[in-house]
A protein has these predicted regions:
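Functional cores that coordinate and move charged inorganic groups
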Residues: 95, 99-191
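Membrane-interface helix termini and inter-helical loops of multi-pass transporters
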Residues: 1-10, 72-76, 123, 222-233, ...
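Entry/N-cap segments of selected transmembrane alpha helices
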Residues: 37-65, 134-143, 147, 223-249, ...
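Transmembrane alpha-helices that form the ion-translocation and gating core
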Residues: 54-92, 240-296, 315-327
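Transmembrane alpha-helix boundary signature
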Residues: 1-9, 13, 29-44, 61-81
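C-terminal ends of transmembrane helices
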Residues: 28-44, 92-103, 146-156, 190-197, ...
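Structural signature of hydrophobic alpha-helical transmembrane segments
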Residues: 15-27, 75-89, 130-143, 177-184, ...
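Predominantly late transmembrane helices and immediately cytosolic-facing juxtamembrane segments
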Residues: 124, 152, 157-167, 171-173, ...
Length: 334
């Protein structure tokens, strides 16, 4: 930890600056997308929002349970949050490549599901993967968030609010809650009139600079164990089961439960087979799962093993999801 004075504490390693600093910008963009969906997107109307909300909950709970079954009470139990995440950029990118084989209503469903999944991941990081809470710093963070929100309502310049956002990042970093939560908190203070322009400005640097840098910095792994030892490790079983099986199972099961209760219905022109295909694509954890790995485990060897498992599970989920969506249509049944 670099100490510039007796009271200013900041991360010092390049990897820390990527994971705590640059990724805060990614979470800022995620927060903007969540807020826009809540204000004017699919999540605005409660009846329409129920299906992706239930799907996201199922897609988080079932993978966590499956991981826990393989790592119950052991030294790797803290990794339960790893298979809960979905890489929104990858999953949406794949549906775009599939073109007309994925109906627009299904793409909208995936967007809403992935955004709720992002929100769930953010809450998990904030609550379960932070450090010891510094209540003074946390209180100062809340006060600064309120100040920024008031300034936004008064139409104070965005530049000044973003500068205050950097101060907010510092306070949250030292509060014991993960620093990236600052990005989401700041995003929720941005008024609707500024959301579209900010999202447009951030999409290219986030998707083509920040995420690739994060991926390159965090996917470099050293194989200190054999292939068979890696494949038969409880972490690999937990992550593979969670992402490849748990994601589609949880999403389909919770959607089915909702439709049986008559609380919602499938997106127009879609089938259960397509919903299962979307569930498989949601198993592409990649960047978000790797990010949670860096918080869940302190051992480099354990992190490397988990990263290999994430890459394998994400690749398998991609292949299964693409195949299912490519060879099916809305007339398909279970």
């Amino acid at each position: 930890e670099t100490i510039f004075s007796s009271s200013i504490h900041l991360p010092h390693s390049f990897l820390h600056w990527i994971n705590d600093g640059l990724m805060s910008i990614f979470f800022f963009l995620a927060g903007l997308e969540i807020k826009r969906e809540l204000l004017e997107g699919e999540l605005k109307e409660p009846k329409k929002a129920l299906l992706p909300i239930f799907a996201a909950i199922g897609g988080m709970l079932v993978p966590a349970v499956l991981y826990a079954l393989f790592n119950k009470g052991g030294e790797f139990a803290n990794g339960w949050g790893i298979p809960m995440a979905t890489d929104i950029a990858f999953s949406l990118g794949i549906t775009s490549l599939l073109g007309k084989r994925v109906p627009l209503s299904l793409k909208v469903f995936l967007i809403a599901l992935a955004i709720i999944d992002d929100l769930g991941a953010i809450l998990i990081i904030a609550v379960f993967y932070g450090g010891q809470i510094n209540w003074l710093m946390l209180g100062a963070s809340v006060a600064l968030i309120l100040l920024i929100a008031i300034l936004a309502r008064k139409k104070v310049s965005l530049s000044l609010r973003l500068i205050l956002g950097i101060c907010l990042w510092y306070l949250i970093f030292n509060s014991g809650i993960h620093a990236t939560v600052a990005g989401v908190a700041l995003a929720f203070t941005v008024p609707l009139r500024e959301l579209g322009d900010l999202e447009h400005r951030l999409h290219i640097p986030v998707n083509f600079l920040i995420l690739p840098i994060f991926a390159l910095a965090n996917t470099a792994v050293s194989f200190n164990t054999g292939i068979m030892e890696t494949l038969t490790h409880p972490i690999n079983f937990g992550i593979m089961a969670g992402l490849v099986i748990g994601k589609p199972l949880g999403i389909v099961a919770f959607c089915y439960m909702l439709t049986q209760m008559k609380w919602g219905k499938l997106p127009a022109g879609t089938s259960w087979t397509q919903i299962s295909g979307i569930g498989m694509l949601a198993g592409i954890g990649f960047t978000m799962s790797i990010f949670i790995t860096t918080l869940a485990f302190t051992s480099t060897d354990t992190q490397d093993l988990a990263k290999v498992s994430i890459l394998l599970a994400s690749l398998l989920s991609l292949i299964l999801g693409c195949s299912t969506l490519y060879f099916t249509n809305s007339r398909s049944s279970f």
